[in-house]
Design a protein with these regions (language model features):
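Accessory terminal helices/loops
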Residues: 2-13, 28, 39, 94-102, ...
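Positively charged, proline/Ser/Thr-rich regional signature most characteristic
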Residues: 7-77
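Conserved beta-strand hairpin/beta-sheet module of binuclear metal-dependent hydrolase folds
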Residues: 37, 123-171, 251-261, 266-267
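Catalytic cysteine-centered active loop of the rhodanese-like fold, especially the PTP/DSP P-loop
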Residues: 56, 64-112
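Active-site HxH/HxHxD metal-binding segment of metal-dependent hydrolases
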Residues: 60, 116, 159-234
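Ser/Thr-glycine-rich phosphate-binding loops at phosphate-binding pockets of nucleotides
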Residues: 89, 180-183, 241, 245, ...
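Cysteine-dependent PTP/DSP-like catalytic domain, specifically the C-terminal lobe
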Residues: 106-124
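Metallo-beta-lactamase
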Residues: 152, 160, 174-177, 211, ...
Length: 396
């Protein structure tokens, strides 16, 4: 349902999405009143352990504040109102304030503003290089900046934040020299081409992913299994880890940090159906099993796994990042202890809906489809569902 015309007050207290995110990360308790239609809220909302959440559509407030709506309001304060663009939420905040509800604050720009939040956390890792994890809370997407001396490389950059990676490298006294993807993404538009086009950064695509027919308007290099990229004095090794996609490639930094893309998460394993569909999923799941047991799990237990996504079920490490030691994941994730066919059955039985617009996003990332910034935002709106399950597979 589109938002109907109503007065938009200009004196309602507001707070930036970044400030709301900071409160969320601190586990401070607060309330969220989402004024979008229920169908828009079910799969994509601001949520967390400290959030008391309610959904009452804005149109319920067009004639004042109904008693049943008051009864549904979270008791936690502040109470943030949020909508799609920051319009109806201001109206509702104003109406609630007039009705005597205290400490109501509208989230600036609504969920569109929430999409612009990017959180940076430097990993506590046994590497000479600094490895910085970037987290987009609106989708759970994770990207990484590797900085050694005056050079930096970014892995799995998002188009929407291309300039931020360049700035982050500069803040650390480095030039961003290369951008590389782990695979052809299905949930967000890659920033590799954007960085090459706008900032002269070297574009790199996994050789196995390029075989799907990557057709960029900019020149790009490929890196094959066992090949290396260098950042300053740091060596980054490409490790072909198919399963989620045929071209899925992880990157081992200083033999200590494994950037697993969408192959292995800290709370789950990858879904296998986004490239070959339902018909190809069983064979892809078998490839994923082989990858996990032949290419990833044999690495040292203290290898730090740094994935490409974090779901709501993911827990933060002590340094605030979404990472974990490989040995812990091997012990705590029952899926990794199953035999091959039991693993395949388990993965195929528990998959969430495919990401919104995933076919159009794949086409865009292959270079078959062109979209502007507004089109990118529309394609990416909503949750990612690249994991095999929305629930944690880990125990403990």
């Amino acid at each position: 349902m589109s938002e109907k015309p109503f007065p938009i007050p200009d004196d309602v207290p507001t707070e930036s999405p970044s400030a709301v995110h900071d409160r969320l990360v601190s586990d401070e308790r607060f309330g969220v009143l989402d004024t979008r239609a229920p169908a828009d809220v079910d799969d994509w909302r601001i949520d967390g352990d400290g959030v008391a959440f309610a959904n009452v559509p804005y149109y319920e407030f067009l004639d004042g504040v109904p008693e049943d709506a008051l009864a549904e309001l979270p008791d936690a304060r502040p109470l943030y109102t949020v909508c799609a663009k920051g319009l109806s939420s201001k109206y509702v905040a104003d109406v609630l304030g007039d009705a005597g509800v205290d400490d109501v604050v509208a989230v600036e720009d609504g969920m569109e503003g929430w999409e612009t939040v990017l959180e940076a956390t430097e990993l506590s890792a046994d590497t000479d290089a600094a490895v910085v994890q970037f987290h987009r809370p609106s989708s759970g997407c994770l990207s990484y900046l590797i900085v050694d001396g005056d050079e930096a490389l970014v892995v799995d950059p998002l188009h929407a934040f291309a300039d931020e990676y360049v700035d982050a490298a500069a803040e650390r006294g480095a030039d961003l020299v290369a951008a590389v993807d782990t695979h052809v993404h299905a949930d967000h538009v890659s920033g590799v081409r954007t960085l090459a086009r706008d900032h002269g950064v070297r574009a790199v695509v996994p050789a196995a992913a390029a075989e799907r027919g990557v057709d960029y308007a900019v020149d790009y290099d490929t890196v094959a299994d066992g090949g290396t990229l260098t950042v300053g004095e740091t060596v980054v090794e490409a490790v072909h880890t198919p399963g989620h996609t045929s071209g899925m490639t992880s990157y081992l930094v200083d033999d200590a940090v494994l950037l697993t893309g969408d192959g292995l998460f800290v709370e789950s394993v990858a879904r296998p159906d986004l490239e070959g569909g339902a018909d190809g999923a069983p064979d892809a799941a078998r490839r994923l099993y082989d990858t996990l047991h032949e290419r990833i799990l044999p690495l040292p237990d203290d290898t730090l796994v740094a994935p490409g996504h974090a779901s709501d079920a993911a827990e933060r490490a002590d340094d605030g990042s979404f990472t974990d030691r490989l040995g812990y994941l091997a012990e705590s994730m029952p899926a990794l202890d199953r035999d091959r066919e039991a693993f395949v059955e388990f993965v195929l039985d528990d998959m969430p809906p495919r990401p919104d617009n995933y076919e159009a996003i794949i086409a865009t990332n292959l270079g078959d489809r062109r979209v502007d910034d507004e089109g990118v935002a529309e394609l990416e709106r909503g949750p990612n569902n690249c994991a095999a399950t929305t629930d944690a597979m880990t125990e403990g």
